[in-house]
């Protein structure tokens, strides 16, 4: 009897194990099916994103070409202040179009658009000076070297951008200045208070590199801003039309407004941010974010010129390329506590 009972128990145990093994099969199959469906959905989403980017690129090109032609026509026949103001308004629209398209445009197309916009802005400034007799006389007496130094062909009937550059006041080259060009900024300085004004910055690329214990104030609307190899610096900048880049910085405090912020190899830095898209950090630690609070008398005008939407601020929407876990916050960046945001900028 005991042997029969043991045999029956063994059979029951074997049946239970077989049933458990069989129950695992559907779970594995279900898991594989879920993974397969997720992969299919990812590929589908990727195709859709590519199609959307392609459509957006076509829309950008068509809109930009149409608006550029309209501005060129206004500038060619600019005989009144009203027509110039209409051209200025359309140029602001083009600036906003570029800002809104920065994420899906190829780098070459983006640069071409920015250069075309810069030429049109220079042509507008030239036409405005053309309505003033004194400025017209100064333009006629300018040497041939300035007119012949352009490297980019302007639109038909529109003066090349370099003429506007040569005819406008340029910053004096101080110690540590990078010199007048499309790029301006400071480098290799320590324990200095550095400033640039709107007339020096407008739609130019700003490069700040190898600064230590410096305070930098940029009053105006640059096109891009790059800060590299800075230590214990304070940087205050007006609205930047496109991107701000930080690399290899430490123990800094920044106030910046921009379309996109990218931070690389930086640590222990506080950033007071206005960003219309998002911030991206990579190989960073100890980064703290808070809303942009710096202000100066002409900042509203500079925001309008930049094309940034001041009502939109994603200062706490940050992507960490070194932290892919969605269910846990990145340890590399955090929100600056409110009690620590009271900064005396000036």
Curated annotation (Swiss-Prot):
The modification Phosphoserine is found at residues 80, 168. Pfam families: TBCC (PF07986), TBCC_N (PF16752). One of its GO terms (biological process) is protein folding. Keywords: Acetylation, Chaperone, Cytoplasm, Phosphoprotein. It is found in: Cytoplasm. The keyword Cytoplasm applies. SMART domains: CARP. Gene3D superfamilies: 2.160.20.70, Tubulin Binding Cofactor C, N-terminal domain. Residues 171-323 form the C-CAP/cofactor C-like domain. The modification N-acetylmethionine is found at residue 1. GO terms for molecular function: GTPase activity; protein-folding chaperone binding; tubulin binding. One of its GO terms (cellular component) is microtubule. Expressed in the retina. Expressed in the rod and cone photoreceptors, extending from the inner segments (IS), through the outer nuclear layer (ONL) and into the synapses in the outer plexiform layer (OPL). Strongly expressed to the photoreceptor connecting cilium at the tips of the IS (at protein level). Its main location: cytoplasm. It comes from the Eukaryota. Supercomplex made of cofactors A to E. Cofactors A and D function by capturing and stabilizing tubulin in a quasi-native conformation. Cofactor E binds to the cofactor D-tubulin complex; interaction with cofactor C then causes the release of tubulin polypeptides that are committed to the native state. Belongs to the TBCC family. Tubulin-folding protein; involved in the final step of the tubulin folding pathway. This is Tubulin-specific chaperone C. It comes from Homo sapiens (Human).
């Amino acid at each position: 009897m005991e042997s029969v009972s043991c045999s029956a128990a063994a059979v029951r145990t074997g049946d239970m194990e077989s049933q458990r093994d069989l129950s695992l099969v559907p779970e594995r199959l279900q898991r594989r099916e879920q993974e397969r469906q997720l992969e299919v959905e990812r590929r589908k989403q990727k195709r859709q994103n590519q199609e959307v980017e392609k459509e957006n690129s076509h829309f950008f090109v068509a809109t930009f070409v149409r608006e550029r032609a309209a501005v060129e026509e206004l500038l060619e026949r600019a005989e009144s202040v009203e027509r110039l103001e209409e051209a200025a308004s359309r140029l602001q629209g083009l600036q906003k179009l570029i800002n809104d398209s920065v994420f899906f445009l190829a780098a070459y197309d983006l640069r071409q658009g920015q250069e075309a916009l810069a030429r049109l802005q220079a042509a507008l400034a030239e036409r405005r000076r053309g309505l003033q007799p004194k400025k017209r006389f100064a333009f006629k007496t300018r040497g041939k070297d300035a007119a012949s130094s352009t490297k980019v062909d302007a639109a038909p009937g529109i003066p090349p951008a370099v003429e506007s550059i040569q005819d406008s006041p340029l910053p004096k080259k101080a110690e540590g200045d990078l010199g007048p060009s499309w790029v301006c900024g400071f480098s290799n300085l320590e324990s200095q208070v550095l400033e640039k004004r709107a007339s020096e910055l407008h739609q130019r690329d700003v490069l700040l590199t190898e600064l230590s214990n410096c305070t930098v104030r940029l009053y105006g609307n640059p096109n891009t801003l790059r800060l590299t190899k800075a230590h214990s610096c304070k940087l205050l900048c007006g609205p930047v039309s496109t991107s701000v880049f930080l690399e290899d910085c430490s123990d800094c405090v920044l106030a910046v407004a921009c379309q996109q912020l990218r931070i690389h190899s930086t640590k222990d830095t506080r950033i007071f941010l206005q960003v219309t898209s998002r911030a991206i950090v990579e190989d960073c630690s100890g980064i703290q974010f808070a809303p942009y609070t710096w202000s100066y008398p002409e900042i509203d005008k500079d925001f309008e010129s930049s094309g940034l939407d001041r009502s939109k601020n994603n200062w706490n929407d940050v992507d960490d390329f070194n932290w892919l876990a969605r269910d846990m916050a990145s340890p590399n960046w955090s929100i600056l506590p409110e009690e620590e945001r009271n900064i005396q900028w000036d």
